[in-house]
């Protein structure tokens, strides 16, 4: 039976660099599991190094146009296809990224909930944009008391709950009970690059400075030219929001950098918590890139024997 390796960890921990070294040593296939690195035309703001976008060993990087509607369900289907193709070629395979919802879907599966019609999705987005998260949350709560389980700051979850109820008349939580999740792959091994926070923060800060000094501002100008809705996933990416505020004249460029650094550190803090609580008990946590490279090379070599 094939074993699927998943490499995750907080933002800026060095997952991509580890995957590059392992791919070069073993010739394995790397499949993206970062919900922002799927997008085309914005490599700097999403930290897509050139090798991620150009090497045939690296899959599902920079392949979705920012204006396209995309979801975790679509990503899971794309990822399953790429994994099975790699296994057909007898290529060792690692799924790499830090997006919790994507990782969870790959490990635990998704409930089979009917998709919403396009006009309902548009209605949900328009309402959220008009009234804001708090009022939108309260409107949902009147329909379904279980909505209290949703973080009102999470626009994607609020929108999905609205869409499901509007489309089917049934709560998304009821659908999840009716349609239990089915694991896409039974044999997964999760490896977590987990550096100490005090080591991660300087890397986050320097990475944001490098992004701004490169082409991040031009990329955000391009996104703004597309007239995407404010709640489009790429428009909510850390770095994008702050640069938009700068381009609109609301803050200075140094203030935008500071805000992006602060928001990225807060995001990393949430990732640390999620990684400790939501992964399988046998997930392997390692603090350094060197240890993770050694571990993955060893485990992949053993598995291929």
Swiss-Prot record:
Site (Interaction with substrate tRNA): 99, 121
Cofactor: Mg(2+)
Catalytic activity: adenosine(37) in tRNA + dimethylallyl diphosphate = N(6)-dimethylallyladenosine(37) in tRNA + diphosphate
Gene3D superfamilies in alphabetical order: 1.10.20.140, P-loop containing nucleotide triphosphate hydrolases
Subunit structure and binding partners: Monomer.
Xref: PANTHER family: TRNA DIMETHYLALLYLTRANSFERASE (PTHR11088:SF60)
Keywords assigned: ATP-binding, Magnesium, Nucleotide-binding, Transferase, tRNA processing
Pfam families: IPPT
HAMAP family, alphabetized: IPP_trans
Organism the protein comes from: Anaplasma marginale (strain St. Maries)
Gene Ontology biological-process entries: tRNA modification
GO MF terms held by the record: ATP binding; tRNA dimethylallyltransferase activity
Purpose: Catalyzes the transfer of a dimethylallyl group onto the adenine at position 37 in tRNAs that read codons beginning with uridine, leading to the formation of N6-(dimethylallyl)adenosine (i(6)A).
Positions with a binding annotation for ATP: 9-16
Entry protein name: tRNA dimethylallyltransferase
Family classification: Belongs to the IPP transferase family.
Cross-referenced InterPro entries: Dimethylallyltransferase, IPT, P-loop_NTPase
Residues that coordinate or bind substrate: 11-16
EC number(s) recorded for this UniProt protein: 2.5.1.75
Region (Interaction with substrate tRNA): 34-37
